[in-house]
């Protein structure tokens, strides 16, 4: 049971070949493109959803920030679809791997911060000191703000990893508990099953929310820096 | 009237059972051939189930069901030990 719990998080390798590449590339199959004005239902639904999300997310940015639209929209689609696909039985979720989330968070955060430093150096440096701080506190506050700046990519990555991993672990554990309880006491098993259903609903929500939060935070870092 | 269609151009359902090995060996196994096969398969599925006037949830669900099945096959080795048996 102990070893079983975490084997579902190991990267899938078949005969030494990285199967994980295929799994990471799979969500792209589910988003077909269409050049038509009136396309099929599937593509129309996706385009409508994408327009909704992009309007809501990119409206706060100026024209320089809006050049990042493609990046942020593909980010939210990728994280959302990968998380939702991970809720299917037996599937592997790439976003449970810290390496992958770091690979997404660090370049995006660094891009936003470096853009800010290159184009608006004074304003970016001014972010380190909130307005209206008493003079004796200034050195300490600059240090604290620097630390909080450098912790941003780590927080982005670890937040996503921890949330998705914890959710999957809880589902495994409670599902196992329901199965084990069925032969002992059916009522308790039913209660546990209800908990499992609620948890699954929560996981669906978390899958989408985490994608949203990740993208929102990157866009906030961008907004600060453009 | 004896118009013999060469083996290479016959479709799979027209190939006789005895000719099957040679038909398989004649297929195009170059990288571009394999890529072409995947592309043809993808568009066959897409145009039959998704790119239609009244597409339903079945087009997407069949893909997800196949994904679940493939993942089950992939992790069968670990799942073998979780069967309800007295002796594993």
Swiss-Prot record, chain B:
A Gene Ontology BP annotation from the UniProt entry: proton transmembrane transport
Range of residues in the leader sequence: none
Disulfide bonding pattern of the chain: none
GO cellular component, one term: mitochondrion
Keywords: Acetylation, ATP synthesis, CF(0), Hydrogen ion transport, Ion transport, Membrane, Mitochondrion, Mitochondrion inner membrane, Phosphoprotein, Transmembrane, Transmembrane helix, Transport
Superkingdom of source: Eukaryota
Predominant location: mitochondrion
Topology of the protein relative to the lipid bilayer: Single-pass membrane protein
Membrane-spanning parts: 62-79
Cross-referenced InterPro entries: F1F0-ATPsyn_F_prd
Subcellular location(s) per record: Mitochondrion; Mitochondrion inner membrane
Positions bearing N6-acetyllysine: 16
Modification type N-acetylalanine: residues: 2
Entry-annotated residues carrying Phosphoserine: 3
The family this protein is said to belong to: Belongs to the ATPase F chain family.
UniProt function note: Subunit f, of the mitochondrial membrane ATP synthase complex (F(1)F(0) ATP synthase or Complex V) that produces ATP from ADP in the presence of a proton gradient across the membrane which is generated by electron transport complexes of the respiratory chain. ATP synthase complex consist of a soluble F(1) head domain - the catalytic core - and a membrane F(1) domain - the membrane proton channel. These two domains are linked by a central stalk rotating inside the F(1) region and a stationary peripheral stalk.
PANTHER family referenced in this protein's UniProt entry, alphabetically: ATP SYNTHASE F CHAIN, MITOCHONDRIAL-RELATED, ATP SYNTHASE SUBUNIT F, MITOCHONDRIAL
Subunit structure: Component of the ATP synthase complex composed at least of ATP5F1A/subunit alpha, ATP5F1B/subunit beta, ATP5MC1/subunit c (homooctomer), MT-ATP6/subunit a, MT-ATP8/subunit 8, ATP5ME/subunit e, ATP5MF/subunit f, ATP5MG/subunit g, ATP5MK/subunit k, ATP5MJ/subunit j, ATP5F1C/subunit gamma, ATP5F1D/subunit delta, ATP5F1E/subunit epsilon, ATP5PF/subunit F6, ATP5PB/subunit b, ATP5PD/subunit d, ATP5PO/subunit OSCP.
Protein name: ATP synthase F(0) complex subunit f, mitochondrial
Phylogenetic placement of the source organism: Eukaryota, Metazoa, Chordata, Craniata, Vertebrata
Gene it is expressed from: ATP5MF
């Amino acid at each position: 049971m102990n070893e079983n719990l975490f084997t579902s998080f190991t990267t899938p390798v078949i005969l030494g070949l990285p199967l994980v590449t295929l799994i990471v590339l799979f969500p792209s199959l589910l988003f077909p493109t269409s050049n038509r004005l009136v396309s099929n239902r599937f593509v129309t639904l996706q385009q409508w959803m994408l327009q909704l999300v992009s309007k809501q997310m990119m409206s706060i940015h100026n024209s320089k920030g809006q050049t990042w639209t493609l990046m942020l929209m593909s980010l939210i689609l990728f994280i959302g679809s990968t998380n939702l696909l991970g809720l299917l039985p037996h599937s592997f979720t790439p976003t449970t791997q810290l390496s992958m989330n770091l690979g997404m968070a660090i370049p995006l955060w660094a891009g936003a911060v470096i853009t800010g430093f290159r184009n608006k150096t004074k304003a970016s440096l001014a972010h380190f000191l909130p307005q209206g701080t008493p003079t004796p506190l200034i050195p300490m506050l600059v240090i604290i703000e620097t630390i909080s700046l450098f912790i941003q990519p780590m927080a982005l990555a670890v937040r996503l990893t921890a949330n998705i991993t914890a959710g999957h672990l809880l589902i495994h554990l409670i599902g196992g508990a329901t199965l084990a309880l069925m032969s002992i006491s059916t009522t308790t098993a039913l209660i546990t099953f209800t908990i499992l259903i609620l948890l699954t609903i929560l996981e669906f929500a978390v899958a989408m929310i985490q994608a949203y939060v990740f993208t929102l935070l990157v866009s906030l870092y961008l907004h600060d820096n453009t | 009237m004896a118009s013999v269609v060469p083996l290479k151009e016959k479709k799979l359902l027209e190939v006789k059972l005895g000719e099957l090995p040679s038909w398989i060996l004649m297929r195009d196994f170059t990288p571009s051939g394999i890529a072409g096969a995947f592309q043809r398969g993808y568009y066959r599925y897409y145009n039959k189930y998704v790119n239609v006037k009244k597409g339903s949830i079945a087009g997407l669900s069949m893909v997800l069901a196949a994904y679940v099945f493939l993942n089950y096959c992939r992790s069968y080795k670990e799942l073998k030990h979780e069967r309800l048996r007295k002796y594993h």
